[in-house]
Amino acid sequence: DKSWRPSSSYYLFDNYKSSFKVKDGRDLNQTYQIILEPFKKKWIPSLKNSKLISNNIEISEDYFNQIYVSRDLIDRKKQISFKRYKTNYYLGEDLKDYYTKTPSNISNRLKTWVLNNNSSTPTEFLNKLYNNFSDGSYYYNLSPQNFSGNNYENFFFNLKEGYCEYYAGTFVLLARLANIPSRIVTGYYGGELNDVGDFYKFKQKDTHAWAEVWLDDKGWVRIDPTSAIPDSNVRNTLNNLSLIHI
């Protein structure tokens, strides 16, 4: 059951726009370009806090999830320009409620784990949760066993083996059970630096999933639970993942 994940962002933004505000935005005077090869998708990757400034592509701006979506499939090479900005976000109570929603069939075992790890601050709980994945019992594997029964319970307590989406999804679910607004984010990780052209090249094999949590004093904070896995527990190809501290 993945009903807790965002699905209809435009409808949600229309209903929650009074709860989501951008404050004190300012230009960082940083621009960059992305060259997209044809990949038959509509979404447009970008760095965080970026404004599209190209006029050579028709897009829909998804304010709710802070992403750009092309109106047409990207079936030819495109060079797209962005400008970065710095901003502070305010998340209203309606959106905080939305980002803490969970499926109705969550197992009592997961709820009990959250209660047993009750913390005085969100950061303390998130550190406990992150460190739980670094205890040596979890493994990274691109070809794990199939889930059965309650997927997240089975992964967290029994299987303990999977790829980035398993870890990000479980992390977000447990954070939400602790009443911490959170969401899954997908994108690219790593890439290859071209020293001659001074650019990074990303391939589909570089796709990755991680978590973002909302902290009132910091806004959306990126946390990659997959990076907690010890190198010795990697059972399939995985680039070294840098730790993200709160």
PLM regions with names:
Residues 1-93:
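Intrinsically disordered, low-complexity N-terminal segments that are enriched in acidic
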Residues 4, 140, 223:
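Short clusters of hydrophobic/aromatic residues that line enzyme substrate/ligand-binding pockets
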Residues 38, 84-86, 144, 186-188, ...:
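A mature extracytoplasmic/lumenal domain signature
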Residues 244-246:
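Conserved small/polar residues in nucleotide/adenosyl-binding loops
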Residues 154-163, 198-202:
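Short, contiguous acidic/charged loop-to-helix segments that flank catalytic cores in large enzymes
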Residues 1, 166-239:
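Hydrophobic/aromatic-rich core segments of domains that either
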